[in-house]
């Protein structure tokens, strides 16, 4: 049957996408680019003949520039939690307000959340960090997403499990939310942090999942419950939907058979701009050092 591939950056990504390519094997296939009802790019691929190999390769060149994740405007009526969406907007957001799950553990967590009047930013920061601190992150290779009750009972979850739990919590609290999947790009910092974690020890990228909440005036704002931080320049969205099933990187059907799945991701810095933390390249530093020794 047809294979649906969701590995092209979404139209709304904040990072500048300079180029994108998708290569598929076997080369004898039909491909049609589409957009789903939520504006995400889909590649529909059909193979006219049976094959024992299905290979997908994507190449992406993007400009990563640091931005302030809190740099957005919020309409006056939505600056404090709780707030109500305007009637017309609420109708448009209906799929993102639909409650899919409930249960004693989910209800208990909702009861534990401070729902007194406070700025919406403070509320979202606290809720996002609550999940990050309450759950242990794990790499879970099983397909699908855990139910909220299962996640809260186990107190451990993959990124997609945490993202779905946050979606449901937000909806129960009256806030429209959607499930986002994409690439997470983490670059090794130029200098070590003196007052907190320094981040990754080497450049890294992988598929990731997070949550987006709709704030009047700001639009969709990303929350990453895995890290407890707001989504930044390293979050490259591929697909955002009301439910996780619509955001899977690849979906389709195959005949019963034995199969093996492998995947590999890598990141390369093509060009770097001078910055305060790295004003010179390593070669330039060596030249400066050599000149200094010569002067001495």
Where are these regions (language model features)?
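Mixed-charge, low-complexity segments
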Residues: 1-157, 172-296
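Short amphipathic alpha-helical face segments that pack within enzyme cores
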Residues: 161-169
């Amino acid at each position: 049957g047809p294979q649906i591939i969701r590995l092209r950056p979404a139209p709304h990504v904040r990072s500048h996408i300079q180029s994108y390519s998708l290569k598929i094997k076997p080369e004898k296939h039909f491909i049609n680019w589409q957009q789903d009802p939520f504006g995400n790019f889909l590649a529909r691929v059909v193979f006219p003949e049976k094959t024992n190999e299905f290979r997908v390769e994507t190449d992406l060149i993007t400009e990563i520039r640091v931005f302030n994740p809190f740099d957005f405007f919020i309409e006056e009526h939505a600056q404090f939690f709780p707030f109500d969406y305007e009637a017309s907007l609420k109708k448009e957001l209906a799929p993102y307000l639909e409650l899919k799950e409930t249960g004693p553990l989910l209800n208990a967590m909702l009861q534990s959340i401070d729902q007194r009047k406070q700025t919406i930013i403070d509320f979202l920061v606290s809720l996002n960090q609550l999940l990050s601190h309450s759950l242990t992150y794990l790499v879970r290779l099983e397909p699908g997403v855990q139910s909220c009750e299962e996640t809260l009972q186990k107190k451990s979850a993959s990124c997609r499990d945490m993202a779905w739990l946050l979606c449901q919590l937000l909806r129960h609290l009256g806030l429209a939310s959607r499930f986002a999947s994409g690439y997470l790009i983490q670059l090794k910092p130029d200098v070590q942090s003196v007052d907190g974690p320094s981040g990754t020890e080497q450049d890294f990228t992988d598929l990731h999942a997070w949550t987006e909440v709709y704030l009047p005036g700001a639009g969709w704002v990303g929350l990453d419950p895995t890290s407890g931080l707001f989504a930044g320049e390293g979050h490259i969205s591929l697909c955002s939907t009301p439910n996780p099933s619509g955001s899977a990187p690849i979906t389709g059907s195959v005949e019963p058979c034995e199969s093996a799945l492998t995947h590999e991701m890598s990141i390369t810095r093509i060009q770097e701009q001078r910055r305060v933390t790295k004003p010179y390249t390593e070669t330039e530093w060596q030249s400066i050092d050599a000149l200094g020794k010569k002067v001495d």
